[in-house]
């Protein structure tokens, strides 16, 4: 049997289809069924899904557990139309504050209508910062209005798919700052690694120079 062929969108993004909204809600409900209360600080929670749970399902889950998210950093190789419109809806409703988004460097050329929609949201103020880069990491950094700083590390992009994905949720200011410092340095850059040198941080020093290669979270003994 010939596999289904997926074509890139050629029409303007304007509304969420009912079937996609149901799929999104299903993914969120799967996560809520795992935990319906806040995560304990200092712990990491490891999750393995059997498909149909994407990156932004996790963000919606956090919003349900913590209420308003004042600031979020998102990195994803790609993002689909449904999730773009979800971000706009949450921001318009006041549930979500500043959105900082980095997508893969090929995204504007490969997903032209989705990129146009993201640029519109940036111009509108929904997205505070929008960049492309040579990135394949899928990360959510969420700062809740209640003060918690939550990190989601996941294999899932911000698009719905039937594949098994894994994620880890941590409430940790140190881990949040570790990733945020990298985002702040690398937003908008096409990173050219000049060496594979690992940087270790004494006393969790997040002002380290990332230009030399890979960053390692941790503290020297």
PLM regions: where:
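PLD/PLD-like phosphodiesterase catalytic module centered on the HKD motif
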Residues: 1-221
């Amino acid at each position: 049997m010939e596999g289904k062929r997926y074509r890139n969108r050629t029409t303007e993004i304007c509304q969420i289809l009912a079937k996609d909204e149901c799929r999104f809600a299903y993914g969120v409900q799967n996560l809520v069924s795992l935990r319906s209360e806040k995560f304990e600080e200092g712990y990491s929670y490891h999750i393995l899904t059997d498909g149909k749970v994407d990156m932004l399902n996790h963000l919606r889950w956090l919003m349900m557990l913590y209420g308003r998210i004042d600031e979020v950093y998102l990195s994803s190789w790609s993002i689909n139309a449904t999730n773009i419109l979800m971000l706009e809806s949450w921001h318009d409703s006041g549930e979500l504050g500043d959105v900082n988004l980095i997508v893969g460097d090929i995204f504007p050329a490969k997903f032209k209508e989705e990129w146009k929609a993201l640029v519109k949201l940036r111009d509108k103020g929904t997205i505070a910062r929008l960049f492309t880069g040579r990135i394949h990491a899928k990360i959510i950094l969420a700062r809740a209005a209640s003060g918690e700083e939550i990190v989601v590390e996941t294999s899932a992009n911000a698009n719905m798919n039937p594949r098994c994905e894994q994620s880890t949720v941590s409430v940790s200011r140190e881990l949040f700052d570790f990733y945020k410092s990298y985002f702040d340095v690398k937003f908008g850059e096409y990173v050219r690694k000049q060496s594979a040198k690992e940087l270790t941080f004494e006393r969790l020093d997040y002002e380290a120079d990332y230009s030399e290669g890979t960053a390692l979270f941790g503290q020297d003994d």
